Regions:
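Extracytoplasmic/lumenal acceptor-recognition loop(s) of multi-pass membrane glycoenzymes
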Residues: 1-49, 89, 94-127, 190-194, ...
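Short, solvent-exposed loop/turn segments at secondary-structure junctions
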Residues: 62-63, 88-90, 281, 321
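Residues that flank catalytic or metal-binding motifs in active/ligand-binding sites
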Residues: 52, 79, 282
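Active-site-proximal, structured, solvent-exposed surfaces of multi-pass membrane proteins
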Residues: 126-351
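Periplasmic/luminal catalytic loop of GT-C fold multi-pass membrane glycosyltransferases
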Residues: 28-76
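Short conserved micro-motifs at the rims of enzyme active sites and ligand-binding pockets
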Residues: 1, 68, 93-96, 276-277, ...
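C-terminal, active-site-flanking charged/polar segments
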Residues: 7, 67-105, 310
Length: 351
């Protein structure tokens, strides 16, 4: 679920700062100074699919320039609009590789891993494919977009204008750590995207044949310092949709959710990873076919298991961190209390 103003609620259970910063590396718009939530406009539509965001509840109208691919209007609840999609990855899906971001314990570090490339590699690992699902807008050989770029330097800033034409159904998205402003068809969309609260932002979703113009402005000193950090990429919507459908077909068994357990029976033709739409937490324990196995941090943020070739009967059990220590301390406290009570009784009897 994604609100207009304050987060993807699903991930508020994840308080691990490293995990949240890793989610930033995947393109999620994380408030990195406090690292407690994921803000709205939090990535491209594949980000939402990774997190299992089936519904968006917002005051905005997600149409025209604001349309998010595959999210369809379902009605209103009070002042809120409700949108639904069928294009979320299953709760557990198989990939053949694990993409790991930098794990740096600093909320202000400069991102060097490209989140679009990480997403592209995840999609490749879902279908075991070498083809690209997300590509740089600079790709002159692109079969999904035509683009023309013009740069004008004024007294205070650079103006970078893109005129594009969609050759297929596409979504165009932006990532940058540096302050900038975005204009969609002349109109300003937002300003001052800054390093403590940033991530992938969708520019526009286009159908085949549509033309569009957008402009980015950035102060001269910022642009001259690191203009390569403005990343604009194009999502091949239908191709990504097919990868998601492939993941659903592979997971033929439903996931069974208990109070503190997750169970699934899944077959794998090769050694691979099973990724769950659960934030990684060291409190999880796992077994495969009754034998203990290690949990894996998938793509820096999600819970995963390394599968064996053949049938895998998986059970996940959650034990809160420090639960054993707390239980031990409670037991010791009870024992000490009982000893004190016994000593007090003995004193009373002696008197």
């Amino acid at each position: 679920m994604k609100y207009d103003y304050s987060s993807i609620d699903y991930f508020t259970s994840s308080r691990n700062r490293i995990t949240l910063r890793n989610m930033y590396s995947l393109g999620y718009n994380v408030q990195r100074e406090t690292a407690l939530w994921i803000t709205s406009d939090s990535g491209d539509w594949f980000n939402y699919s990774l997190a299992g965001v089936k519904y968006i509840i917002t005051r905005k109208n997600l149409d025209n320039d604001n349309k998010i691919y595959s999210y369809e209007y379902k009605g209103k609840y009070g002042e809120f609009n409700i949108y639904e999609t069928q294009n979320t990855l299953p709760y557990a899906y198989i990939v053949n590789s694990n993409q790991q971001p930098e794990e740096i314990d600093d909320p202000f570090y400069e991102q060097t891993k490209n989140p679009f490339e990480m997403q592209n590699n995840i999609l490749k690992s879902i279908q075991n494919s070498d083809e690209d699902y997300i590509e740089n807008i600079k790709n002159e050989q692109s079969k999904i977009i035509k683009s023309e770029k013009n740069i004008v330097k004024t007294d205070k800033e650079y103006e970078i204008t893109y005129n594009v034409e969609a050759l297929q159904n596409i979504s165009i998205s932006l990532f940058s750590d540096n302050n900038l402003e975005l204009y969609k068809n002349i109109f300003k969309d937002y300003s001052n995207i800054w390093e403590r609260e940033t991530g992938i932002r969708q520019i526009v979703n286009l159908e085949k044949g549509q033309k569009y113009t957008f402009k980015i402005t950035q102060k001269i000193e910022k642009y001259d310092l690191n203009n390569d950090n403005i990343k604009i990429y194009v999502l091949n919507n239908h191709k990504i949709e097919k990868a998601i459908e492939h993941a659903k077909q592979v997971q033929t068994q439903k996931v069974t959710l208990g109070k503190d357990t997750v169970k699934i029976n899944i077959r794998s033709d090769n050694e691979a990873y099973l990724t769950f739409q659960i934030p990684f937490d060291s409190g999880w324990r796992a077994t495969i076919n009754g034998q203990k196995t290690e949990i894996v941090k998938m793509n820096g943020a999600f819970l995963g298991i390394k599968l064996q070739k053949g049938n895998n009967e998986i059970k996940l059990t959650y034990i809160p961190r420090y639960f054993k220590i707390s239980a031990l301390l409670s037991l010791i406290s009870i024992m000490v209390l009982l000893i004190i009570i016994c000593l007090e009784k003995r004193k009373s009897n002696i008197i």
